[in-house]
Structures are given as C-alpha cells and as structure tokens.
C-alpha cells in the first residue's frame, strides 16, 4: 500500500536568534560608573594627586633656580633656562602620572575587587581597561594644568588657541601611550611591589636620557644616541618649539638628530604610530589575561 501527500511539508525553526549587537550606551555607563569610583578614591585620599603636582613643581622651582643665573644663550638662543626647563617638566609630569596608572588596577587585583568586576554581568570587560585609562588620562591632564600655570610665573608666555590644541594633543599622546603600557604591566607583574620597583627604576632614567634638562649638543655622543631614541625627547622638543615660536608650522625642523631633522608633523605622527603599535600589543596581552 502506498500513501501520497498532496502538500509538501517544510520544517521551520520556532526560535529566532538575533545577531549580537554592540551596546554602546551600556558600555559608556559602565565606564562612567567605574571612573566615578576611581575619582571617589582620589577625593577620599588626595595624597596621590597632590604628590603628582608637588614633585614636578619642585623640579621646576629647585632645578630651575639652580641654573637661573646661567647666560640666556647658553642652552638655546634668547631663552632662559626656566623657560627651557618648563617644557621638559610638563612632559615629565604627564609621563610620571601615566606610569603610575597601573597601580589602582594592581591593588584591585590584590584585594580581590578585580575578581568581583570580572564575575559581574558587564556588557564588556574592556570597560575596566577604558575606565582606568580615562581616569588616569584626566588625572595626568589635571596635574599638567597646574604645572603649566606654574610655568607662567617662571617666564613662559600663554599659548594661543591653535598652539594649545597642539600642546594638548602631544601631552595626550604621551599620556595614552604610557598609560596603556602601565595597565599591561599591572596584569603581567605578580604584585604592586614589582610594579613600584619598575616605576622607580624607569622614571628618572627616562628623564635624564631626554632633552628635558639639557639640549642634545650638551650630551656626550652615547647619550645623544639614547636621547634620540627616547620618545619623550620628541614630545619635549615639540612643546618647546610651540612655546618659543608664535608662527610655528608642521614642516619646520624642530630637533636635529644624527639621522636627520624632525619636524612637528613628524613628531605627532611618530607619537601616534607608537600609540597604535602599543595599543595593538597591549590589547593582545589584556585579552589573554581577562579571558
């Protein structure tokens, strides 16, 4: 016996699965809440913020006072040493603040709060990283603003609006790049003692091996080579160029090194390139640690 079906039977799924969406608003809310927590910690314990302002201010006042009677043309043409030093201290302030950005995350690891965040129903775990980076960038910029105001009393003239934008861009590129490196170290190193030891070892050598305290031609050849490889030297010379030239441009030579002249546009491109490379490397490290 045979059976014939007049209609063709089609199987259709009852459940429909939507493709995953990016909840940008919820991620922004997560970052905002975590940033507020970090700022609340600073409000309750402002010693970190005060130390980040007082230390570079002491460098600016004491080290600048040490060479205040030096001839005006000794370091650069028609520039006093206080004006010469202020650009280096501004970049050094942003560098030091960003270098310490991994400490709050390291303490969260040690006290177990990071584990609570990782087990919380977050939309994205990257909000933990973005909140720490945003917080330390804002904190470093606050410290830089205080040093800029202090440098006005040391002989620096106020910047124009265009110069202020380029100034802020250079400081931001330095801060973001070093912040990403410090956050990666906070996941890589075993504890805060190792991170503090690394910060103490790295901090001053980066300062002395840059053009913050003296120009390149004051240094021996071996130190000139190290300073030419130090990214802080390019950021310092870029800010120094903006302060000393009201009619600056992106193509004029800013710093002369052994392998050529570097312009302001090339300095910004170099810092941006280093940030992109650093972000790629750090993102791979953080993905491996967070997952």
UniProtKB/Swiss-Prot annotation:
The keyword Chloroplast applies. Keywords: Chloroplast, Membrane, Plastid, Transmembrane, Transmembrane helix, Transport. Residues 47-289 form the ABC transmembrane type-2 domain. It is found in: Plastid, Chloroplast membrane. It comes from the Eukaryota. Pfam families: ABC2_membrane. Its main location: plastid. It is a multi-pass membrane protein. GO terms for molecular function: ABC-type transporter activity. The chain crosses the membrane at residues 47-67, 87-107, 135-155, 165-185, 195-215, 262-282. GO terms for cellular component: ATP-binding cassette (ABC) transporter complex; chloroplast membrane. Belongs to the ABC-2 integral membrane protein family. PANTHER family: TRANSPORT PERMEASE PROTEIN, TRANSPORT PERMEASE YVFS-RELATED. This is Putative transport permease ycf38. The lineage of its organism: Eukaryota, Rhodophyta, Bangiophyceae, Bangiales, Bangiaceae. The gene is ycf38.
């Amino acid at each position: 016996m045979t059976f014939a079906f007049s209609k063709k039977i089609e199987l259709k799924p009852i459940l429909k699965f939507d493709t995953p969406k990016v909840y940008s608003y919820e991620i922004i809310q997560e970052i905002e809440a975590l940033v507020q927590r970090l700022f609340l910690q600073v409000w309750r314990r402002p010693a970190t913020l005060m130390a980040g302002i007082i230390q570079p201010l002491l460098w600016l006042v004491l080290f600048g006072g040490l060479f205040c009677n030096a001839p005006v043309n000794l370091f650069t043409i028609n520039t006093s040493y206080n004006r010469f030093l202020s650009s280096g201290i501004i970049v050094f302030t942003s560098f030091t603040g960003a270098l310490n950005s991994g400490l709050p995350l390291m303490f969260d690891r040690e006290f177990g709060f990071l584990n609570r965040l990782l087990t919380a129903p977050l939309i994205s775990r990257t909000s933990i990283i973005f909140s720490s980076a945003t917080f330390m960038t804002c904190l470093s910029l606050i410290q830089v603003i205080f040093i800029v105001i202090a440098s006005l009393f040391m002989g620096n003239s106020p910047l124009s609006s265009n110069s202020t934008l380029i100034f802020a861009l250079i400081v931001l590129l330095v801060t973001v790049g070093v912040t990403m490196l410090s956050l990666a170290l906070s996941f890589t190193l075993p504890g805060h003692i190792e991170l503090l030891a690394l910060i103490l070892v790295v901090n001053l050598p980066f300062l002395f091996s840059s053009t913050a305290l003296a120009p390149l031609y004051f240094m021996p050849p071996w130190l000139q080579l190290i300073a030419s490889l130090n990214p802080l030297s390019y950021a310092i010379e870029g800010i120094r160029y903006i302060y000393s030239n009201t009619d600056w441009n992106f193509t004029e030579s800013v710093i002369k090194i052994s392998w050529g002249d570097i312009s302001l546009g090339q300095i910004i491109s170099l810092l941006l390139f280093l940030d992109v490379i650093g972000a790629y490397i750090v993102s791979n490290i953080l993905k491996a640690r967070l997952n």
